[in-house]
Amino acid sequence: MSVLKLHVKVFRFETNKDYNPAYESYFLEYQEDQYLLDLLKQLKGVSYNENIALKINQIAVFEDAKVSDLVAFFSKEWVLDPLSKRYALKDLVIDEKAVLKNYEDFFKQVPYITKGEKEELEKFIQINFINPQTNPKYLGDGFFLYVKWLMKRYPTERDRLLEMISQPESGVMNFLSVAHYLYKNDDNIDHEIYELQEILTNSKIKPWKDFSKNLLSLFQYNSNPPKTPNPPKTCALFNAYAKHLNAQSLLKSAKLYLEKMGQKIIDLPFCYDGGYYGKIISTHDFLTASAYNLALAKANGVSLIFCEEDAYLNILHAKEVLDNNPEIIDSINEKLKKYQLVYEKGIEIVYLNEWVNEFLAWELKSPFDAFLGAEFSRIKQSDHFFNKIRLKAPHFLESFQNYAPLLEVNEISGLLQCTHLRYLGIDLGADFLIAHSLGLFYAFENLSLKASKIYKRDNDNTPTLFLPQIALMAMGEKNTQALGLDAHYHKFTFI
């Protein structure tokens, strides 16, 4: 059996002994049939938990996986860290007792639980450290799952327990997906906590009762939408975004790009789907709006194109739920009858940024070989487009983060964490940032001055662009109005 090699940098630190941590480099050999624990045993003098709980390249790993599988996921360059550097006890082991002390006040408020139930929190506590959030007040995902467990055991205390995790600055509404930060991108934790958020936003607890009411009021349907089964058009561009995000810059550049690609676009009155929190607050309303939008495109014989990441991820989720639940389709189609629409499986949707990345048969007139871009996207894509236009856009883990949804529930935390991302990109030396999310674009552009003050850093004028704008500039387009650049807060001066 062949011997394979791996380069590993290991976090070394012992509390009460070391002032600063350090990373020690190892070149390890392994065989195809070996597991992570076999590898850790080669690290002489390094402390670790035999019930695997650590981070590889900032991704949490909780299983003794085969090394070959881990190499396929992480490549052959690893950085091993404890789940939390803040609570590092020795090397890869954290001080869980110190973490548990944070919940002493909570336990004083629930005197009815048993000693065994109190100790149950220990089984959840490691989950707190998957989430990369930097909000120091955040109570933690593991703690939220523990409270959910208690709610099932004490249904009469459900509302009181829910209220304890409802605070805007520290509570469960601050949760964002952790799937990208967990080995194998497991989304079970996401679904468990989304369910808890749904329970909270449908309760009578303030401010979430009003938050839900206000969001649901934004679902607006056209009572008599147009229907042209055989139109002289080929596609429709989804255009129903929250008004404060000012999507015109993105929509204008996306439309121009599609026209240059030979597409003919029909404008349709799509319905807002509630954005990030739509599917959490009311699954049925979210699915109805999504089905309406898909059925409207179908009724007009066109493909439905999404030029924005968050809306595209929403429609993917909606289609998956709808297409796997015929009874939900039947229920929603009853509602759609009033609009003379019918939802059916197989309606074509397209993500414009994937199109930009794959359809490259056009002449490059303005290469970007002198520029560096910092891209922020939750959807992994190849570098085909960047290679075509000769743009350097280095990968970094934080590029998968998006804290813009927090602006709706905890503005200060959302601003701080979005601004942290913005300056990570700027400090990499980026000439411009690339946002695939309208919410993140809004934070980077419109809120940058306010956010920089809170972040305690002088505001930087580095602009943020959308992918269609970059593609158009690479094709030679220089009209700032046509590109939608005139609506940006930070002016793009490189044309």
Language-model features: where?
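Iron-sulfur cluster-binding electron-transfer modules in prokaryotic oxidoreductases
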Residues: 2-24, 36, 202-495
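Signature of N-terminal electron-transfer/Fe-S-associated modules in redox systems
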Residues: 2-216
